A protein has these predicted regions:
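Hydrophobic alpha-helical segments and their helix-loop boundaries in membrane
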Residues: 2-260
């Protein structure tokens, strides 16, 4: 009995010692919190794509291009959305890579243990991207308008720094800036197709063929022009080149957008 008691006592002491050693080890975030964080990111992913990336500009420009060509529902919305997503992935790849290296890698390595630090690290590359687009297009008025409505003094913009602009003010200002840039590019896309419409309409009137719908005549010429100039590569390439990057001068971006 004494031997059995000693054995049980030794086992209890060993278990207690093991528990003490385990409690002394640093603990990171629990698996439950990691799963909750992952589900939150997945849920907010569509909103993040819409609000903080170049998706808005690309999708709006492609939609305006479809209207300018007068092709109705061709290409289908699924095609334009898919093309916009793929172009967004190409443009946002450097920014996403920064987020991964500066936030995800330290978080997985245990160097970041609280969500506030993780958020601060992850949002900085996105903030740099959004500020770069606003600066390249010169659409600071949208940012000042949002900040003014939030009660922030913008009477002297020279005193403001990027640190004074939070995400609540930056995101809507960025979206308004992207919409303005998209409409500017859409206007430039409309011009050649508008010329074709005017020429064809004038020819039909001069030939007393006013009963013939101009769309039946202009659409083949629009498609021919678009194919001859390799329109898809030209439009998508210009779209991806219109976003400010570290290796692209602001003057070149402004020329693509039509601000030069």
């Amino acid at each position: 009995m004494a031997a059995a008691g000693d054995a049980l006592g030794g086992a209890y002491a060993g278990a207690a010692g093991a528990g003490t050693k385990d409690s002394d080890r640093p603990r990171g975030l629990s698996p439950v919190l990691n799963i909750m964080l992952l589900l939150t990111v997945i849920t907010l992913a569509p909103s993040i794509v819409l609000m903080g990336t170049c998706f808005i500009r690309i999708l709006v420009v492609l939609g305006l291009l479809r209207q300018a060509m007068g092709t109705g529902s061709l290409p289908p919305p699924q095609v334009t959305v898919s093309l916009s997503l793929m172009a967004t992935m190409v443009v946002m790849a450097p920014t996403v890579d920064r987020v991964y290296k500066e936030a995800v890698v330290p978080f997985r390595a245990g160097e970041i243990t609280d969500y506030r630090t993780l958020w601060d690290k992850a949002k900085q590359p996105m903030r740099d991207f959004m500020f770069a687009q606003i600066e390249a297009t010169g659409n600071w008025s949208s940012l000042y308008m949002v900040m003014s409505h939030r009660g922030i003094d913008v009477s002297d913009p020279s005193r403001l720094t990027r640190a004074d602009v939070d995400m609540v003010s930056l995101v809507p200002a960025f979206m308004l800036s992207e919409l303005r840039a998209a409409f500017m590019m859409g206007f430039r896309l409309y011009l050649p197709f508008l010329v074709i419409d005017m020429v064809i309409a004038t020819m039909l009137i001069s030939m007393s063929m006013m009963m013939l719908p101009p769309v039946l005549v202009t659409l083949p010429f629009k498609l021919l022009l678009f194919v001859l100039v390799d329109g898809w590569a030209l439009v998508v390439g210009s779209l991806m080149g219109s976003f400010a990057r570290p290796d692209v001068a602001t003057a070149a971006v402004n020329f693509v957008l039509g601000y030069a």
